[in-house]
A protein has these predicted regions:
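Active-site signature of cysteine proteases
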Residues: 24, 185-229
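Surface-exposed loop/edge segments in extracytoplasmic proteins
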Residues: 11-17, 46-48, 187-190, 199-202
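Short aromatic-glycine-(Arg/Gly/Cys) micro-motifs in beta-strand/loop hairpins
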Residues: 1-15, 31-37, 42, 46
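Extracytoplasmic/periplasmic, Sec-exported soluble proteins
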Residues: 17, 58, 91-99, 143-146, ...
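Conserved beta-strand/loop element in small beta-rich adapter and peptidoglycan-binding domains
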Residues: 18-23
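...with weaker cross-activation on analogous glycine-rich loops/strands in unrelated enzymes
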Residues: 113-200
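N-terminal capping segments
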Residues: 53-117
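Short amphipathic alpha-helices within nucleic acid-binding modules
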Residues: 25-29
């Protein structure tokens, strides 16, 4: 028998209805790919991921979970003073998040807890903190937009659309980041994104173009999580 489950969450995470045929299980997982579901056997061993890897599906599962949590708990867009991944457990969380802090939060829930700062989180705007964290965590940089996969962190925008008065050292940093959840239809992509109040309050994943050059949000690069046991 084959089942749908969330990788790294054990056999307890599998859905109750099983499939005699592996291909039927794969088709069912494909229909739930943006939520992180994979195929396992009757013993809970990983068989297949529609996202390309168990790690990618694991990230998508937590992206959906965090996106739902933000919406249901009234989070607002802003420059968080505390790392929301840690602050959510405090007595009075500030409930402020942004595109970069959201990605850091998702990665924290997915097990990337080392080097996560308790204050400010992992900022992106005019800062290398998020990129440095990804490199330190073993993520691989992808420079070709045609090679992005589900679960990748997509970075957009650059110095051509920065404020003219911005000091030169800050002009090369990307301006936005989100988690790619894979292709949809008509050249669009699913994404998990906390770049505005409207996004935070929406049911995710959203469906948009991968980049928006007319808004200065064109693909810069992506980062992909390393494989793990």
């Amino acid at each position: 028998m084959f089942y749908l489950y969330i990788p790294f969450h054990g056999i307890e995470s599998r859905l109750p209805d099983g499939f005699d045929c592996r291909e039927d299980a794969m088709q069912a997982a494909q229909s739930k790919r943006v939520y992180g579901y994979c195929v396992c056997d009757g013993q809970g061993n990983f068989v297949w991921s529609p996202a390309g890897s168990a790690v990618a599906s694991h990230i998508l599962y937590h992206a959906k979970d965090v996106a739902d949590y933000m919406r249901e708990h009234g989070y607002k867009y802003g420059d968080a003073d505390q790392n929301p991944a840690l602050d959510k457990h405090s007595e009075n969380p500030e409930k402020i998040v942004s595109c970069d802090r959201f990605c850091g939060w998702v990665l924290y829930e997915a097990g990337y807890t080392e080097h996560q700062p308790p204050r400010k989180g992992l900022p992106l705007y005019f800062s290398p903190n998020l990129e440095e964290f990804l490199v330190a965590s073993g993520f691989a940089r992808i420079d070709d937009a045609a090679k992005v996969r589900p679960g990748d962190l997509i970075f957009e925008g650059d110095s051509h659309h920065m404020p003219p008065a911005l000091p030169e050292p800050y002009r090369g940093y990307p301006r936005h980041v989100f988690i790619n959840a894979g292709p949809a239809e008509d050249g669009l992509f699913y994404r998990y994104d906390a770049g505005s109040d409207q996004r935070i309050q929406s049911v995710q994943p959203m469906i948009e173009r991968l980049s928006k050059p007319e808004q200065g949000r064109y693909f810069r690069f992506a980062f992909r999580a390393p494989e793990r046991d």
